[in-house]
Every structure is written in structure tokens, then in C-alpha cells.
Amino acid sequence: MKKIICFVILIITSFGCEKDSMNEPQIDQTTQYSIPDSLNFSILDNNLKITIKNEGKIAIHYNVENSNKHIKISSSAGEIAVGNQNDMIVSINRDDLSKGKFYSKLYFNFNNKKDSIVIGVDNFIEQKVILNSDVIDAEYSKVKDQLVFVSEHPMQVNILKSGSETIQTIPLLYTPTCISISQDGETAVVGHDGHITYVNLNTKSIIKTYNVSCFAIDIVLGNNKWAYVFPKENQSTYIRCINMNLSTENENHDNVNQIYAGTKGKMDLSGKFIYGAANGVSPADIDKFDIQNGTAVKIYDSPYHGDYPFNGDFWFSEDGNRIFTRGRTVLRISETKSQDLIYNGTINATVPEGHGNIEWLDHSSKKNNLYLILSSGYYWPPTRISGIFIYDSTNLNFKSKLELEKFFVPNNENGVFYDAEPYFVFSNAEATSLFVITKAKGAGLAKEWAIQKIAI
């Protein structure tokens, strides 16, 4: 609050103004008033009040100048008798107002004396797409430029094209646990507990549902119309290989080589092989399986046994020549065994709490970037760090961090912001946008999942 005292020195014919104090000598006090220094609009405020008090000995005549189209005032002029006050309502029109904090001024004239009030406005625009579902698993087809994810509530496949904000869906009969998209982006297979569902992403329909003798923690759709199901349970188990060309007696597995339950699998770019990252065992390793004859047959594992951390998951480079592991180790891969799964560097993903794991990774060769979701520490479940970390895909050096839009929850006062916890990140085919699937961390919202589209 500022108090303005304007007075006349009778010895000379000039005027003076001072805030919160009076000059000496004081002979004839004429105009004295008080107004706030500033008016600050929170995200939820649209109307605030300014009180103008006449604390002098004569009436005050005033007018207000406002040139900002986003600011409206209830009156632009008035008169205040001695000892009285006037209230003026200031309103904010947030249409076309950009996101963030902006400032403007209202200019006052009190009995020909100028003054001003700073107007501050905090504006929040919901730029992310709030989902009407949760997110269990997700993949992105750069061939079709579309994001595909499965949800439990409701049980469905969800499809979002890169240039659209409309999500198309395919209802499912069983609770989904994982999804794999075909390399051509035409079809996908969804894993369940005891079943898998083969879907057509073009017609948004179910092709067929098949029985499977396990709970699917991960699944891979081959180019041969086989589905490879990785079991969640039983420490030593087998990859269930489902020949979807057959309606019955279509489950096979390699009787010789077992895997550890919880293994995560992905098919390489050639479509001939699947790599699998073991979980629940130390040291964790990566196995290679040949699927050219349908059934997945283990042919060998990496030459390292505890030399480098793999930590149970991995992602391919776009050209299919490298693997980036959850433990930040980078490996070269090849169809030649002596050149396959060979150490090729480490991503120095240092976080404030120490060296964390990579929880998700996407590679854009056009940008020469790796987009990482990182966790802090080594505890389970992992604490995901809000933000997308960008690394150079050639030298593996850190470049920058992209901040994520928080979730805003209104309350009776100013509202609360919750961090956006990232789960999946994908770059589109042209490397112009990132799609980040986030969850409102600790908010407990009915709709706590969202997709953020970020220009890159």
C-alpha cells in the first residue's frame, strides 16, 4: 500500500509529491490518497478490487488510463470526498493470453498528479491432453506416425495419430498387460493373463483372441504372424511362442533353453531375432533368440557377466545397430556373433540422488538425440524424475533437459501444482515433436494421466 501526499509550499509556486512521508516545511496540505503498489492475479483470479482512499483535506478527482486489451476496469474516472474511498474492480480477460506471467500498468491522475499500479497476471493454459484412461504400456509406430497404448480402465487399445488430438479406441475383452506393434504399423498384439489379442489398427477391430499358458509381462509381435509372450511368473520358464496362423494347438516353446520370469523382449530391425533382458537375477544378462523358424530358440547371450550393468530392459537405436540398456550401458549388435552385444560406451546419466537407471528411451537419428526418462537411486519402485533428458546419440554426452507441464488442481485459494511423472517418450518420424505420457505424481486425481506434445 502506498500513501501519496501532495502539498503546496506557499513560499514558491511549485508542487511536490512523496510516498509515505511529507517534506518540510508543510504549510497547506491539499491532496492525500492511498492506493496499492500492485495487484496480482493468481491462476484462479479473474476479478480483484482496488480501493482508493482520500486521506487529505480536499476532494479528489481522478481518472484511469488502461491500454491493455486483457485488462478491464469497472470505472475510468471518479470523485472521492474527504475521508471517503472508492472501489474499482479490475477484471482479466484471459482469451488469447499466453501461458506464464505477464505485467502491465494502470495509470492514474489524482488532481493532476500522476501515479500507477502494477498489474501482475499468472496465466496457466492446459496444453497437455488429459486422458480418460490410465496407461499400462505404450509403443509408437514411426511408419504410421501414431502412438498406441493400452489401458486397464477402461480395457482398450488407444490410438493417437501424430497430427491429431482425437484418440480412437478398440475395446478389449481382457485386462491388458502389454502391447507390441508390428513393424509396418498395421497390427498389434496385446498381452493379458492367460490370453493374447490380435488387433487391426487400421480398422480398429479385434482379429482374434488366443489362449496362452501364462501371465504376459511382455510381448513381441513378429513379422511372421507369431506372438512371443514373456511370462511374469515362475523363476525359470519359457517364452510362449504363439503361431497366430493357427486357431488351435498353436503354442510352442524351446524345450532346452529357459529364461527368467520377468524378461523383457524386443525384436531387432531384421525381424529375424529377439533380444531379451533378464530381470530378477544378478548379474543381469541379455540373451539372443532366433525366430526365423517360428519358435524362439536361444542361440547365445552377451559375453559379459557382471562387467557392465544392463538392469533388465533396453531400447534399439533407429538404425537397429545399437542397444541402450536400462543400466546405461550401450552395446553394438550384429548378425555376426563375434560382433554382437559388444560394449560401445556408457550414458553418464547422473542425477542429483546419484546414478539412476533409464526408465524409457527414444532415439531420433534426424536430431541425433537420445530422449531419456531417468529414475533416481536404485530402489523399487523407481522414483522417476520429472523432465526429459536429452543426450547426443553419437558421443553420449548430456545436452539439455526439457521441463514437463505440471498438473494444476484448483482449490479454494490458489490451487496446487503436481509434478508430471514421465512414463513413456516418443519422437515422431519427422523429429518435430515429442509425445510424453505423464502421470500426476501424488495428486490422486480421477484423471491423472496425460499426453504432452512438445515441439523439438
Each language-model region and where it sits:
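Structural motif
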Residues: 155-158, 197-198, 235-242, 281-288, ...
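Surface-exposed binding patches on compact interaction domains or structured appendages
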Residues: 19-37, 55-89
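Blade-level signature of beta-propeller repeat domains, shared across WD40, Kelch, NHL, RCC1
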Residues: 415-456
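Bacterial Sec-dependent N-terminal signal peptides
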Residues: 13-38, 111-125
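Repeated scaffold domains used in trafficking and secretory/extracellular systems
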Residues: 133-140, 174-181, 214-224, 255-271, ...
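A short beta-strand micro-motif common to beta-rich folds, especially ectodomain repeats
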Residues: 50, 100-112
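Short loop/turn segments that connect beta-strands within beta-propeller blades
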Residues: 161-165, 200-204, 243-247, 290-294, ...
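A short beta-strand motif characteristic of beta-propeller blades
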Residues: 124-131, 165-171, 205-210, 248-258, ...
